[in-house]
Amino acid sequence: MNRPSARYALPEFTERLSTGLRTLDPYSKLLDERIVFLGTPIDDTSANDVMAQFMHLEHLAPDRDISLYINSPGGSFSAMTAVYDTMQFVSCDVETICLGQAASAAAVLLAGGTPGKRLALPGARVLIHQPSLPAPVQGQASDLVIQAAELARTREQLEELLVRHTGQSPERVAADIERDKILDAPAAVAYGLVDRVVPSRKSSAAAPGAR
């Protein structure tokens, strides 16, 4: 698994099992607790890591929730849709929790959690905007036409996902993503991107929600 880089050495935990000692880093320990942490930009590598963890946890216990903690600036739309589709594909309910930020593609993953189980910490922020092409954009005129058509299709798909998971009208979503729309945690609840703001783990027990 490609773990987020740190400016210092991550601590390790040693546990005594019936089969002997086992040493874990924090991310492996979180996985034991059915917590997947997305703390990097979303690209093919991080998406593959998240998808592999989801499928592993579903195999271990298909009837238990998976918690996806998000602190990400967003990233690749295609990588995001791979994770999103996996979230919908697995039989487990997926609880999403935003701490820090869920921006751009990460906001869609936050909103795509199981209804009633989409949470944000008080200091979190969520940002939505329209997709864009990475710079520099190069190629022949015919190539640019193809890229423009794909960008328009991507925007339509993004709008459909936000409408589906927020309950906002297509017209409002289309207008809101024209420029960066930044929402604090209460505003994200009002918009429908998350269900509740949770100040502590004691208050994070989510009511069961239909998928």
From Swiss-Prot:
- Report which superkingdom the organism of origin falls in: Bacteria
Q: Where is the active site?
A: S104, H129
Q: Which residues cross the membrane?
A: none
Xref: InterPro entries: ClpP (IPR001907), ClpP/crotonase-like_dom_sf (IPR029045), ClpP/TepA (IPR023562), ClpP_His_AS (IPR033135), ClpP_Ser_AS (IPR018215)
SUPFAM superfamilies noted in UniProt: ClpP/crotonase (SSF52096)
Subcellular location as annotated:
Cytoplasm
The answer to whether UniProt assigns keyword Iron-sulfur to this entry is no
Q: Which GO terms describe its biological process?
A: protein quality control for misfolded or incompletely synthesized proteins
Q: Does the keyword Metal-binding apply?
A: no
Query: May I have one GO cellular component term?
Result: endopeptidase Clp complex
Tell me one GO molecular function of this protein: serine-type endopeptidase activity
Pfam families, per this entry? CLP_protease (PF00574)
The reaction(s) annotated as catalysed by this protein in its Swiss-Prot or TrEMBL entry are:
Hydrolysis of proteins to small peptides in the presence of ATP and magnesium. alpha-casein is the usual test substrate. In the absence of ATP, only oligopeptides shorter than five residues are hydrolyzed (such as succinyl-Leu-Tyr-|-NHMec, and Leu-Tyr-Leu-|-Tyr-Trp, in which cleavage of the -Tyr-|-Leu- and -Tyr-|-Trp bonds also occurs)
| Keywords noted in UniProt | Cytoplasm, Hydrolase, Protease, Serine protease
Q: What is its EC number?
A: 3.4.21.92
Q: What does this protein do?
A: Cleaves peptides in various proteins in a process that requires ATP hydrolysis. Has a chymotrypsin-like activity. Plays a major role in the degradation of misfolded proteins.
**The protein's assembly and partners:** Fourteen ClpP subunits assemble into 2 heptameric rings which stack back to back to give a disk-like structure with a central cavity, resembling the structure of eukaryotic proteasomes.
Family classification = Belongs to the peptidase S14 family.
The protein, known as: ATP-dependent Clp protease proteolytic subunit 5
Which organism's genome codes for this protein? Streptomyces avermitilis (strain ATCC 31267 / DSM 46492 / JCM 5070 / NBRC 14893 / NCIMB 12804 / NRRL 8165 / MA-4680)
